[in-house]
Amino acid sequence: MKRTILITGGAGFIGSHVVRLFVTKYPDYRIVNLDKLTYAGNLANLRDIEDSPNYVFEKGDICDLDMLRALFGQYDIDGVIHLAAESHVDRSIRDPFTFARTNVLGTLSLLEAAREYWDGKWEGKLFYHISTDEVYGALELTRPEGDAAGGESGGGPFGEEFFTEETKYAPHSPYSASKASSDHFVRAYHDTYGMPTLVTNCSNNYGPYQFPEKLIPLFINNIRHRKPLPVYGRGENVRDWLYVEDHARAIDVIFHRGKVADTYNIGGFNEWKNIDLIRVIVRTVDRLLGNPEGTSEKLITHVTDRAGHDMRYAIDSRKLKRELGWQPSLQFEEGIEKTVRWYLQNQKWMDDITSGEYQEYYQSMYKDR
């Protein structure tokens, strides 16, 4: 094999798309997928490539340094794409220690295993850390409506400011604080030891295989089962959305051509207020299910806002386009159509993961709001 790449969290939402892309695009690479298989990790996400000769799955915890040391030695790993993380803000508010353990100590353990194994022989090595735009804090909502596309109140900017690679960190949730800390550790390992590193910060992803604690698959599933659609506060918060396969393509480009020790922002230039996004989802699901227009609108239920709910995230990814030629390939309207169709056509996948522990979590999060 030409290279051996360790991808952590490869059974999760974004990770499974990255694993699939690398396994199929680079048959001369050996791809080692390390995943703990927590509630959000699902090997069914990779059923189509699990028998590929250049793919290996290893179950393990990134906080287990001894296991990581053995893994680097066993597979002679020369590149890391680190996606394994706890990522849901609501869960971080309820259980910040788990987020600190996985996102901070797990990243540190992985860095240390790589540093020890590579032992200063940095040529051909790379530690690529995937992070979030939430580390930057929040932006002001200075335009009540975005530059509407097709009459929708979404798609265009809701303010003058955007997160750039120079934006100072100002995390507001335990989740974003844990990711900010892990980002700093990655950069510190470059500055202190000379390890070749890269960090990227991405906006909200959507698409197939996303665990239904996140807004889009949650609401598709709730509409299907005629359950309430819980909207935090008035639903005025704004997020920038990127189709997950476009994110995977960006990771590929940056891993192979990015400048060592640099940071790249990955975004969709595609801002939507939560309430407007939800209405698009409602209309799309109703249309694809053959429901009369407006059937599911009445399921929208405003609930108590999340503590410390940031108003607006918006990524400026022009550096990535300018230096490496990447830009999103999918417009939001096309992406949300593909996404809704996928979940409706893969109801068994959804049913399999929305049982047991997930149902208990869902009730604990929303029953009293």
Where are these regions (language model features)?
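Short aromatic-enriched loop/helix-cap "lid" or pocket-rim segments at secondary-structure transitions
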Residues: 43-46, 139-143, 210-213, 277-279, ...
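C-terminal substrate-binding subdomain of Rossmann-fold SDR/epimerase-dehydratase oxidoreductases
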Residues: 2-6, 31, 60-63, 147, ...
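Alpha-helix N-cap/helix-start motif
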Residues: 15, 42, 92, 208-212, ...
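The catalytic Tyr-centered alpha-helix of NAD(P)H-dependent dehydrogenases
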Residues: 171-178, 208, 212, 216, ...
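A general lysine-centric signal
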Residues: 36, 179, 214, 319-321
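Acidic donor-diphosphate engagement hotspot in glycosyltransferases and nucleotidyltransferases
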Residues: 18, 139-140, 210, 215, ...
